[in-house]
Amino acid sequence: MTTQLNINSVIENAKRVITPLSPISIFAARNPWEGLEADTFEDVAKWLRDVRDVDIFPNKALIESAVARGELDESVFNQLVTDMLLEHHYNIPQHYINLYIDNIKTLKDVPASYMNHSNVDVVADLLLEKSKRDMADSYHHYDVRPMSDAIIDEQGEPLSEQVNRQMIKWTKLYIDQFLSSWTMPKREQSFYHAWLHLAQHDHSFTKAQRQVIKGLPNDPKMTIESVLTHFSIDQEDYQAYVEGHLLALPGWAGMLYYRSQQHHFEQHLLTDYLAIRLVVEQLLVGDEFKSVTKDCESRSENWFKQTVASWCYYSDMPSDVLLQHDVNEIQTFIHFAATMNKNVFKNLWLIAWEMTYESQLKQKIKAGHESVAGALDVNQVNVSENDNANQPHSVLLNDTQAVDENNSELNQVGTSTKAQIAFCIDVRSEPFRRHIEAAGPFETIGIAGFFGLPIQKDAVDEQFKHDSLPVMVPPAYRIKEFADRYDMNVYRQQQQTMSSMFYTFKLMKNNVMPSLLLPELSGPFLSLSTIVNSIMPRKSRASLQKITQKWLKKPETKLTIDREFDRTSDLPVGFTEQEQIDFALQALKLMDLTEAFAPFVVLAGHASHSHNNPHHASLECGACGGASSGFNAKLLAMICNRPNVRQGLKQSGVYIPETTVFAAAEHHTSTDTLAWVYVPDTLSSIALDAYESLNDAMPMISEHANRERLDKLPTIGRVNHPVEEAQRFASDWSEVRPEWGLAKNASFIIGRRQLTKGIDLEGRTFLHNYDWRKDKDGKLLNTIISGPALVAQWINLQYYASTVAPHFYGSGNKATQTVTSGVGVMQGNASDLMYGLSWQSVMAADRTMYHSPIRLLVVVQAPDYVVARLLANNDHFARKVSNHWLRLMSVNEEGRFKSWI
């Protein structure tokens, strides 16, 4: 029992190196390093470099591109280098230091000839004998790698590649429940037991190996313990060894991790996976593991050689000259080279890049207003801070920080404002919002696209239920869509007719004999479809939509807003009246819309339309778990129009005028259009006027927004008809880049719209409304940071990882991807499950960067004491800041910016 508990603990702790990966159809951005954020970004970068040879700093080409484009100010980098050198004193001639710095900061690689020089070996051996305890012991942990990594097979590749191929084969077989007609036998028992049943008949193993498989324990934990003992792995190194195996195929392991969280009967799936993988490794390695050295001396010797070669190359000191110095001097030189290694300078380049962006953003905000203080209207608020308010965790609050309830600016909307449109914080909404505000008397608002509703949606036109909220939060309610019974019966019949046709096609395709006949039957139709879709993508797509709308028209639907009893549902269906009031109040507070209502309030979710795109969900709403957010917008709009809800809101201090009407729409990000999802049958006269005004302005808004967006796509130049061109991109099934998605995202601004209104933020900024004056206890800010800001950081780091290490964290070239097992994409038929973004999503061309890989900058518009309180109360966020997983800046009531580092 003790051993099994230990193995459980090892696996639980080792999971930190991977992230749960949802199927590609419900793709949701994930931070690949979320489990590692207890360590600093720099330490994780060093660790990944050592254990997997993965570099998560921007490389030389990316840095040079950023400098050439003006995104990275070299003077900022040079100042960082100067500051770093001033912090230390080295007893080394200054000209050697200068030469070393001038050379290494270019990020040039050390030529192989330096590593192979005999004098370098002599110096390395000398240092190893004298000081290996002082300088190399820290590298011992990184030697705990899978045995198969250290053994080279007859083809000259690590034996771990054979292990990977075996695991890809078996994992695909287990996961595939939808594409194949015959699923893995005995999979209902467990992955491990199904593998035991089949592997003993697998002739890719020798007869002796199959006999070993027959004798394996039925308990996967016992199997893991047995293999680790067989390899003589120390118990203190169990976790590091298991982590190495999880990192070997982080995509497939991440998919199993996700499934283990979703289904109780698969909760031990990672344990099964590791047991199988370790057995396969043991079978393939055989007795060769005895030749693998257990100590770190060979790694340490190689490290010394690399460091000596680096010193000689970057300082321009020949190795024979180095040998002329005494041992203590040599040790000083090498210690300097070890301290000032290339990763240190890569990190400084990254920081300089981020500081340059931060400076440019501040200048944009300052240039957009005569002063930030004027935009904040500080004279309207009576603020009193403790003398130590600027010091984190030393804050006193008093009631004088409350908002003056009689403030005319806060309680009255501008007389000319006709509509207020609340958009998702998605960076793609920023240009669209800017063009809407420029087109007429319209105000825009930023809020997370799930609108604060923790729901699972059950839509009539979707096959499966979907959690329509951020992936880190479980749904608390289920909302069903329903229609008139007669209309629903007709629609279901139409659905069944369509699905039966597709099911028949799939059945023939996936079975041996019928698949031989399928080309003859479907060839003419599919050939015609291919030609039409290739030559006239926009027209063919429009025609298909017309046919679909005619033959499979979704009926007018309603939502189960009120609580219903449903014994078949594991979640409450609908809300109680008080819950409706509470969720409406919370959403309005998060939008900073508790007064000054316009006649027409639009809640706009967003969706993306593309054709033949396995990654379409990555372009949908991240706050809704990789789906469109129109459903949530419709639900909240319907709730806010209810008289009993408005009465409850009034009792809570939020008065919505009777003439104000809420509606719902979807912002289609691939075409920059606004599609109505829900408009009440009856509108007040002023709401109707606002609705018509917005509709009249929308064609011009779409044209301007599309022109701005299309100009950034690399494959087209200036276009005369941007709306039609955008529709063509969204309809073209050969288009690998229908839109840029969230590429170039860089910042998250939490504050009043006046701070950024009219400023071109280039579609790089998540914008969330917030007024610190209405948030006395800081709960609203904490909610924004814990939800939307966290989602934004995950998105940011997924784009970052896919750019700096595309081979490990990206998903390769879209044109050569293979959709596998209905869950993700591979390159070829035996690769890891590629869970990041494709090359075309982050690069404009093979050697031309588009996305700028910098960590998210969170900007909070509030006094210092508010931010300090946030850091004191939210340890999770404070750790992200202190460990450099994101950057934090604030702008206070006097217009002063402050970086919290």
Swiss-Prot record:
Keywords: Cell membrane, Membrane, Metal-binding, Transport, Zinc
Cellular compartment(s): Cell membrane
Needed cofactors: Zn(2+)
Main location as per UniProt: membrane
Membrane topology reported for the UniProt record: Peripheral membrane protein
Domain of life: Bacteria
GO cellular component, one term: plasma membrane
GO function terms (MF aspect): zinc ion binding
Pfam families (UniProt xref): DabA
Purpose of the protein: Part of an energy-coupled inorganic carbon pump.
Subunit structure and binding partners: Forms a complex with DabB.
Family in the record: Belongs to the inorganic carbon transporter (TC 9.A.2) DabA family.
The protein, known as: Probable inorganic carbon transporter subunit DabA
Biological source species: Staphylococcus aureus (strain MSSA476)
